[in-house]
Design a protein with these regions (language model features):
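Cytosolic regulatory regions of ion transport systems
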Residues: 1-351
């Protein structure tokens, strides 16, 4: 065990992870990363803390997914959103509707027509294919275009793609599990939040804890209930129950009734591409969010390459610091000499 650089305790049971970490720490593992569901262990006055078990880093899947969902709510016209350089740069995915002014035009033409919008089209996801576009690549209907841009240009890039930016005010969450409760607690001060929970006991219990959230004791798949709650007036619907089939069905149902933004949470990645094709606006997985957190922690410790993975496209985003002794650069390159298998999304120089 002393030769182990990292011990990753990633089971779904907190107690098993704690014991594994303690044994690994006792046997001399250099670094220990632990996955925990219960966020109470992070509280200052917690009886049990990660430090007591020799844990260096803790990853909370629900918390990671919560952050991703909140980012999507702030930019509701996007289906994927990742931040770089402490939020100064963003990579966002936008699905192109038939009415998008980009359809039928190539990348070079769009760049020439919009010289004052700083952006880079980094990736296109088209059906089951993900590829790096070229200057003559034409945009097609239902393409998911991934743009890299400064945060200050978010509204401009969405307008360029034919999306009308709108602000979310009314949010409905289905499922009062860990993720649903955390979202409601975080969002209730800034939005009008309603949360649906079919378990009467649980609904009554969380109703006492969420003072600014309307807790609805009902079945989120009941059409009569949804119409009585004027579901069509909801700006955002988040399907966050523990059953991903229920989440998928609920998402399709409310999308049919005209909810502007539907965010679906699923555990596995099997359904990602399928649900995107049938009209779900954004898909989030707490497991993928947790994987990203683990990768960032390891890369950060090694001062190596921070890697961001995306849920359903075969692309990684890498942040590379170029120095005189950089082991990844053996010779000088110009942009024209780069392989077609990757592109440079942005360069930070002198801040």
């Amino acid at each position: 065990m002393k030769n182990i650089d990292y011990l990753l305790a990633l089971t779904r049971i907190d107690e098993v992870n704690f014991v594994s970490c303690y044994i690994a720490h006792f046997l001399g593992a250099k670094k220990i990363i632990c996955r925990l569901r219960n966020t109470e262990y992070s509280h200052r006055n917690a009886t049990i803390t990660a430090e007591q078990f020799g844990i260096d880093h803790v990853v909370y899947p629900e918390r990671a997914a919560q952050q991703e969902i909140e980012n999507l709510i702030r930019e509701p016209s996007t289906i994927d959103l990742q931040e770089f350089k402490n939020g100064k740069v963003k990579m966002l995915g936008i699905q192109l509707d038939p009415s998008s002014p980009l359809i039928g035009r190539n990348v070079a033409n769009i760049e020439q027509s919009n010289p004052y919008i700083p952006h880079k089209l980094a990736v296109i996801n088209r059906g089951d294919i993900t590829f790096i576009p070229h200057k003559d690549t034409k945009y097609k209907v239902n393409d998911i275009a991934y743009f890299v841009l400064p945060t200050t240009a978010l509204n401009e890039i969405q307008s360029m793609a034919g999306k009308s930016p709108f602000k979310v005010k009314n949010i409905m969450i289905m499922g009062a599990g860990k993720l649903g409760r955390s979202l409601a607690k975080s969002l209730q001060e800034d939005y009008n939040v309603r949360i649906i929970e079919h378990n009467h006991t649980k609904a009554k219990k969380i109703g006492k804890k969420l003072s600014n959230t309307l807790v609805l004791d009902a079945d989120g798949l009941d059409v009569d209930f949804l119409t009585s709650e004027n579901i069509e007036e909801a700006d955002c619907f988040i399907a966050a129950t523990e059953n991903e089939q229920t989440n998928i069905l609920a998402s399709l149902l409310v999308k049919h009734y005209g909810v502007k933004q539907v965010i679906l949470h699923i555990t596995t990645t099997n359904y990602f591409r399928a649900v995107r094709r049938i009209g779900i606006d954004a898909v989030v997985s707490k497991n993928i969010s947790a994987v990203n957190e683990v990768l960032k922690l390891i890369r950060s410790d090694q001062q190596d390459l921070p890697v961001t993975r995306f849920e359903d496209i075969d692309i990684d985003a890498i942040e590379l610091t170029v120095s005189t002794d950089c082991k990844y650069l053996r010779k000088r390159y110009t942009l024209e000499q780069l392989s077609e298998e990757y592109c440079i999304g942005f360069i930070t120089r002198n801040n």
